[in-house]
Amino acid sequence: MSSSSHNDNKIPPEKTTTPPLSSSNEDIYNPADSSNVLSSNQTLVSTNNNNNNNQNNNQNNNQNNDGKDTMDHLSYLSTIDSKRREQSYLKSFYQRFIIEDVVKNFTPAYFVSVMGTGISSSLLYNFPFPAYWLQICGYVMFGLTCTFFIGNIILLIMSCAYYPNRFRDYHVDPSRAVFMGAFSMGYITIVNFIALITKGEHIYFVWTLWWLAVFSAMYTSFLIVYLSFMSKLNESDVEAKLNATLLLPIVAITVVSSSGHSIELDLPHVHQTVLTMIVSFMLWSLSISMAFMVMTLYMGRLIIHKIPPTNLIMTSFLPVGFLGQSSYSIYLFGNNLNKFIPEELLYGKISLCLSGFVSVFLLSFGYFMCFVAVTSVLSKIRPFAKNPNPSHTNRFGLLKLEKSFWSMTFPMGTMSLSNTEIGHGGVGNYPLLTFKVMGSIFAAACIFITVGCSIGVVVYSFKKLREDMTNKNKYRNESMV
């Protein structure tokens, strides 16, 4: 009994069999299967989350690596820059400041300062309403002119010596080559002042200097204009650089023409006077023919593309310089013919009248271009400009004092010369006070702008020198620490 009951109480283990997937068409629910599915889904979700986390971590790592690479690159550049500064300050003052700063940044445009101071010295010495103290100021200004001229000549030679490619650029590149005309005109202003103070003495010395001026003017107006704008040596976009600065090499022959007319009557022999007179008139005719071609292109560009940008706005005064100087030259020619030809002949009077008409015609055009230039400058400053260019204007909306201000000096001076000469009343021996007053106004404007620009040059030079010495001392102190 006991054994049987004991055997009956034993429950055999249940055999659980998993039906095959193909046993029937119906789905059979099994809790174990659902738990397995849930666990597998959780596993997939966790796997996806891990993958997403890994991707995010990889992206963060990539971003961190990119940021690190950027920081490393910036630190590398700063290290290179600091090493360059360190190496530069290890050099001598001559190599560091003179060669790598002054000579490296030199351009022939610096000769515009010689033009401005040179014509200002002549205006001070021969002011429309003369005074002795003005003549003394003229001598001082002439000394400044010679200083600028000699300094720029030295920089020009050093620039071509240390940077040989620049000699080609000074003849081919339109943005640089045209300013070689400023070199010629600056030299001619020195010759003019020497002719004023010698008053006919040492005329052969002055005449020799004038022939050198003729050669330099012809060199710039022929060779440089051809190489920079007509030859195939220049592969740059000339149309983009076609502005009023192209007049600079051409105005040089106008200036040397008027210089010849101012000394021709002091020559002792008739054939020398006639030769100088004819050559000077030919130079004036050449400048008129070339300049009016350029003026046509310039006016067309001005009408189509409107006034120049702020950094080139001062070039609007360059046509004024050509018109004023050509007016002055042709009037001197007619006046000299009237004095040279005997009075019993009418040819001198006729030549004076014709030259006077042409001179007034050119002067009137000069007044118009002066109006265009002044209006163009005013349009770049407040209150006429709503949004002045911040890189060229100060916080008051006015133009900053820059090197381009030198472009105003010589044109104002030429307008003064022309007005003053007409005001002397050569035609009919009748002085014209109005033109003398206008000549005084233009002369005062030229002199004041020249003085301001000269002060700016001195201040800028001392500022650069002090900055170099300060950085040198700073580096020396850091290296000692």
UniProtKB/Swiss-Prot annotation:
Q: Which InterPro entries match?
A: SLAC1/Mae1/Ssu1/TehA, Sulfite_efflux_TDT, Voltage-dep_anion_channel_sf
Q: Where is the composition biased (Low complexity)?
A: 48-65
Q: Name its cellular compartments.
A: Cell membrane
| Location of the region described as Disordered in the Swiss-Prot/TrEMBL record | 1-71
Segments traversing the membrane: 109-129, 138-158, 177-197, 205-225, 245-265, 274-294, 313-333, 354-374, 439-459
Q: Which residues lie on this side of the membrane: Cytoplasmic?
A: 1-108, 159-176, 226-244, 295-312, 375-438
**Extracellular-side segments:** 130-137, 198-204, 266-273, 334-353, 460-481
Q: Which UniProt keywords apply?
A: Cell membrane, Membrane, Phosphoprotein, Transmembrane, Transmembrane helix, Transport, Virulence
What is the superkingdom listed in this entry's lineage?
Eukaryota
Q: Which Pfam families match?
A: SLAC1
| Bilayer topology term | Multi-pass membrane protein
Summary of the knockout phenotype: Leads to enhanced sensitivity to both cysteine and sulfite.
GO cellular component, alphabetical, reads:
plasma membrane
Could you tell me the Gene Ontology terms of the biological process aspect for this record?
A: cellular response to starvation; filamentous growth; filamentous growth of a population of unicellular organisms in response to biotic stimulus; filamentous growth of a population of unicellular organisms in response to starvation; sulfite transmembrane transport
In the induction comment, the record states:
Up-regulated by cysteine, nitic oxide, and in response to neutrophil phagocytosis. Expression is under the control of GCN2, GCN4 and ZCF2.
The role this protein plays is: Sulfite efflux pump required for the secretion of sulfite as a reducing agent. Plays a role in resistance to neutrophils during infection. Involved in transition to filamentous growth, which is believed to be central to the virulence of this human pathogen.
Protein name in UniProt: Sulfite efflux pump SSU1
Q: Give the species.
A: Candida albicans (strain SC5314 / ATCC MYA-2876) (Yeast)
